């Protein structure tokens, strides 16, 4: 599906929980398509100038410096905006001319209009869970993207990933995945973020280095998820029940 979107110059939105593999997926697709990848981590202070570029003062005057979005447009790269809803709406709106038939990037400060080079593609990602409780994309922006839904892989596949990436044996990997699935069931009980595959891999790497399994789970999985004493207690109980 992603390859077809790229071939037809369609912008893509990757939707899924934190740590489920969205960034790894886009890195793989850029490699598979043979395109350079420009990654931008979005945040509240990200401005249009941070994306497009700005004039810099030099000893002999001023010089224009392209931002990462402009470089991607010129080079025909895949431009990946990670967690796009963290950016302000007045920043996101500069993407609109690149997501329709025009495929252009107007640069007001220089008066230049850049036509996207062959191979350019705009890709954004966001977490539709916790982020929608705080902020969301405008409908006028959402409808410019083809949406691909992501989720955590099935248990056996996730265990294989944890074993490979974390370096633990399959039995420990299955235990970590089982713990992760139990903890994900706490989302409706006040847990804002569920444990990602990334957290399970972090715990696996600690275990590989010789850290006891329960302690590795506490510091790599339980503590990053919550500061609420009651939730921490419930999660620690699940760890103890999983690795008896």
Residue locations for each model-derived region?
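AAA+ P-loop NTPase catalytic core and its hallmark functional loops
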Residues: 1-174, 178, 240-244
């Amino acid at each position: 599906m992603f390859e077809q979107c790229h071939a037809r110059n369609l912008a893509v939105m990757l939707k899924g929980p934190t740590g489920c593999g969205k960034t790894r997926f886009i890195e793989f697709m850029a490699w598979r398509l043979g395109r350079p990848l420009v990654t931008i981590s979005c945040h509240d202070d990200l401005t249009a100038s941070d994306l497009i570029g700005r004039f810099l003062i030099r000893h002999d005057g001023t010089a224009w410096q392209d931002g990462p979005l402009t470089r991607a447009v010129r080079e025909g790269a895949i431009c990946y905006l990670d967690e796009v809803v963290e950016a302000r709406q007045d920043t996101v709106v500069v993407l609109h001319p690149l997501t329709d038939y025009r495929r252009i990037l107007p640069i007001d400060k220089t008066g230049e209009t850049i036509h996207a080079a062959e191979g350019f593609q705009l890709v954004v990602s966001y977490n539709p869970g916790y982020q929608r409780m705080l902020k969301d994309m405008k409908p006028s922006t959402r409808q410019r993207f083809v949406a691909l839904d992501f989720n955590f892989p099935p248990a056996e596949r996730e265990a294989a990933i944890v074993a490979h990436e974390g370096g633990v044996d399959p039995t420990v990997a299955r235990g970590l995945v089982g713990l992760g699935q139990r903890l994900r069931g706490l989302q409706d009980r006040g847990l804002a973020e569920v444990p990602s595959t990334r957290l399970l891999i972090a715990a696996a790497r600690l275990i590989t280095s010789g850290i006891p399994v329960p302690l590795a789970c506490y510091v790599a999985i339980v503590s990053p998820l919550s500061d609420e004493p009651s939730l921490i207690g419930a999660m620690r109980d699940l760890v103890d029940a999983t690795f008896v």
